[in-house]
């Protein structure tokens, strides 16, 4: 395979960078079985600690005493990447595995006071794939004919420390000081680092060991109970400026004079500003409805919101655009012990078709989320929760350019996602 084509194949099949686990831009669509079953909606509808600590810290004033939530999410994707270059056609599929994302949330309010506190350890996103080398494959043949084995792993955790205050019987305000931990590894790293041999073949170094990066970003929110049946809420999550991910690596060209010599690799991947707003409705004694909107500003964010496309022979990753999301969920108290929930979430696709090569990472094609779940009160102090969701396959189809930016084919990225969550809520 020519170096030009091998490079393009690599970029199309390996740039499955971090956000791939997410079902809504770079994040999961909801956190915990309650919030997830409601389609991620609830910025104006107090329910439990995980949704409050993720989307609106003002909601923790709804706690009566201590409330602790434990949750685990299981999800599995289905990546397909189809490339067409002249008469050559290829399909790449990942070694899809069930992934696990945990979450813990706590909130406390003295019923006689107005101050509430919250703390969490929340998995926001996670991704892992492993494509084996295959001598018979156009895509994954060993170097220099293909690109060999391809591996990626990304995890992001949010650690919120929240405080909220009930200003009046109707109005609560809250703030969360959020610490974010990102962990990222990719082998090889298909970015601006590479070695050339005499024939012009590119050899990319590995960044396979998980690199850790930290960010700090505050979050602000309010909740207003306009009437017994209507409430409104909103929150603002400020941008997350992670330090660049860094790896100790070596030069990869076996024929080069510096083969095996050390080099340091870096990749800058930050998080966006997010504005959420919503309406909470209680049309009946046992019925609760949440309707939310969310704006995620990816444009200009390092790593995610760059220009995209081929620039000076290097593909800029992602090139995502700003995204609007609509969420809605319904909760029905069926019996004294049983609650059922259903939800829907629609998110615009952050990928731009004109630079789809840059945005390769099929999970970003997710748009429609169908969700449902239930809760059961086992004891006065304990509720068990479960939910499921399905995101049908969506496609992003765009040009397949060469390193000079000339279109030589097409690229079709698609994915689907299936998930299930279980959890427990303790109140005491």
Where are the predicted features?
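Charged, amphipathic alpha-helical interaction segments
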Residues: 16-17, 62, 230
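Outer-membrane beta-barrel translocator/receptor signature
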Residues: 46-55, 60-132
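Bacterial N-terminal signal peptides that target proteins for export
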Residues: 1-9
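Generic secretory/membrane-interface signal
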Residues: 9, 50, 311-313
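Sec/Tat signal peptide C-region and signal peptidase I cleavage site
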Residues: 19-23
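Bacterial N-terminal signal peptides
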Residues: 9-18
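Outer-membrane beta-barrel porins/channels
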Residues: 24-39, 43, 86, 99-428
């Amino acid at each position: 395979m020519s170096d030009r084509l091998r490079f393009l194949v690599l970029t199309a099949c390996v740039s499955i960078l971090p956000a791939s686990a997410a079902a809504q831009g770079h994040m999961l669509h909801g956190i915990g079985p309650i919030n997830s079953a409601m389609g991620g909606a609830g910025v104006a509808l107090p329910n439990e600690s995980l949704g409050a600590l993720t989307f609106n810290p003002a909601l923790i004033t709804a706690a009566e005493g201590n409330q602790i939530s434990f949750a685990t999410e299981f999800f599995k994707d289905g990546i397909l990447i189809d490339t067409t270059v002249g008469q050559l056609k290829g399909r790449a599929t990942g070694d899809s595995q069930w992934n696990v994302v945990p979450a813990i949330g706590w909130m406390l309010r003295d019923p006689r006071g107005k101050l509430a506190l919250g703390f969490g350890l929340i998995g926001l996103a996670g991704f892992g794939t492993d494509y084996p080398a295959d001598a018979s494959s156009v895509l994954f043949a060993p170097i220099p004919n293909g690109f060999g084995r391809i591996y990626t792993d990304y995890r992001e955790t949010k650690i919120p420390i929240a405080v909220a205050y009930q200003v009046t019987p109707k109005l609560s305000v809250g703030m969360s000081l959020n610490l974010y931990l990102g962990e990222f590894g990719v082998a090889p790293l298909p970015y601006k680092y590479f070695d050339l041999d005499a024939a012009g073949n590119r050899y990319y170094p590995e960044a396979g060991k998980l690199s850790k990066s930290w960010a700090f970003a505050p979050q602000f929110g309010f909740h207003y109970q306009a009437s017994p049946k209507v409430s409104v809420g909103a929150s603002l999550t400020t941008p997350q400026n992670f330090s660049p991910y860094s790896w100790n690596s070596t030069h990869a060209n076996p024929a080069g004079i510096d083969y095996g010599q050390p080099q340091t690799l870096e990749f800058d991947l930050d998080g966006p500003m997010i504005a959420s707003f919503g309406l909470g409705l209680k049309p009946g004694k046992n019925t609760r409805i949440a309707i939310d909107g969310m704006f995620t500003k990816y444009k200009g964010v390092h790593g995610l919101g760059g220009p995209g496309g081929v620039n000076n022979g290097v593909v800029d990753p992602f090139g995502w655009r700003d995204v609007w999301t609509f969420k809605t969920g319904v909760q029905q108290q069926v019996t004294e012990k049983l609650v059922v929930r259903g939800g829907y979430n629609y998110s615009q696709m952050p990928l731009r078709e004109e630079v789809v090569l840059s945005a390769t990472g099929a999970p970003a094609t997710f748009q429609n989320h169908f969700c449902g779940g239930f809760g059961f009160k086992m004891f006065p102090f304990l509720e068990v929760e479960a939910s499921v969701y399905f995101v049908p396959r969506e496609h992003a189809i765009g040009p397949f350019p060469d390193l000079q930016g000339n279109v030589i084919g097409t690229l079709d990225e698609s994915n689907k996602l299936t998930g299930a969550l279980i959890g427990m809520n303790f109140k005491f």
